[in-house]
Amino acid sequence: MWLVRGGKATQPDGHTLARLWGALPPDIRLSPHLYLATNSAQGPWWILGWSERVPGAEDLLPAPLPPYRVLTGLADRFGRTLTYRREAAGDLAGEITGVTDGAGREFRLVLTTQAQRAEEARTSSLSSSDSSRPLSASAFPDTLPGTEYGPDRGIRLSAVWLMHDPAYPESLPGAPLARYTYTEAGELLAVYDRSNTQVRAFTYDAQHPGRMVAHRYAGRPEMRYRYDDTGRVVEQLNPAGLSYRYLYEQDRITVTDSLNRREVLHTEGGAGLKRVVKKELADGSVTRSGYDAAGRLTAQTDAAGR
């Protein structure tokens, strides 16, 4: 991992990052107010800035210095960039609500809170034909419970709009490029394209929030999943194709399809570093993979031993 501060036109000849640094646009590369991070000489750069205050051109350093940095953009090894715009105040403060790509196209990300979605659902319930049974606050709560990762603020992406296109400035679409709906628990329910056609649908286990039990692409059959008591998938059911069963043992997972073909995955490591180190395929062949102490792939051996 490299952490670099802007303000320098070039890196020394032979430096690992010299070519990647030189591909950055000058306004990024020469700005001492930006920090950049990368974990590869192939990129991308993660551009770290701040959204609270933009320094003036005459400022040597922002005053006061920000106590932390946030992701404000990306730059790849060809100099193409993505720039993120964040909300400065309100319920969405700090959230990304705008993106500009390397071609100059500007996109608006419409975010909603759990309270907004709950109010919309209750209003829709009152105006529906079944208004005798309005949606209760308990059925669609205004807040979401915390998760193992911390508090859930309930903020979700609801739509993506194209706001500016330099190539076609007068031909902007009158509908969002994509639209998303959610369950009362904040789970992704459906995805719609720019023609308002539903292209994805998801179903969840009511007893286990966030556990997807089915999903479907438009025009395709619904895929369903069964879980064991520990939350692991034990069966994947496809009514129009191959289904799979999963058997979990110590350091191995056996996968059997609906044609009774079997593969065995041998694993090593624990928690986030568990990796598949050997795969026994249905035809009897074996492939192997090697990893370093950080869990990064270092070698692969095919079925012929190469």
Where do the PLM segments sit?
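Extended charged/polar low-complexity repeat regions
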Residues: M1-R306
